[in-house]
């Protein structure tokens, strides 16, 4: 059985054979579940500031623990 990929931007798991894989010249590999994630990644948007990403949820939990 093939491994599920995790989006490098939003953190969502997606099926093998879907999405897009981007490999940089230095060998780092990025997986994207959608064109939206890919665009936001290359535009330099911070995933911690977008409510629909897993990084936002994790940052939100850490902020709640501090208070």
Swiss-Prot record:
Pfam families: Ribosomal_L24e
Zinc finger (C4-type): 7-37
Keywords attached to this entry: Metal-binding, Ribonucleoprotein, Ribosomal protein, RNA-binding, rRNA-binding, Zinc, Zinc-finger
Gene3D superfamilies: Ribosomal protein L24e (2.30.170.20)
Binding site for Zn(2+): 7, 10, 33, 37
GO molecular function: rRNA binding; structural constituent of ribosome; zinc ion binding
Signal peptide: none
Cofactor: Zn(2+)
Cofactor note text: Binds 1 zinc ion per subunit.
Subunit structure: Part of the 50S ribosomal subunit. Forms a cluster with proteins L3 and L14.
NCBIfam families per the UniProt record, alphabetical: PRK14891.1-1 (NF034186)
Full protein name: Large ribosomal subunit protein eL24
Organism: Thermococcus sibiricus (strain DSM 12597 / MM 739)
């Amino acid at each position: 059985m093939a491994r599920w990929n995790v989006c490098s931007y939003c953190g969502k798991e997606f099926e093998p054979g879907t999405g897009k894989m981007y490999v940089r010249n230095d060998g780092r590999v990025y997986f994207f579940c959608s064109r939206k994630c890919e665009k936001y990644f290359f535009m330099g948007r911070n995933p911690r500031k977008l409510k629909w990403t897993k990084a936002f949820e994790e940052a939100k939990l850490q902020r709640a623990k501090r208070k």
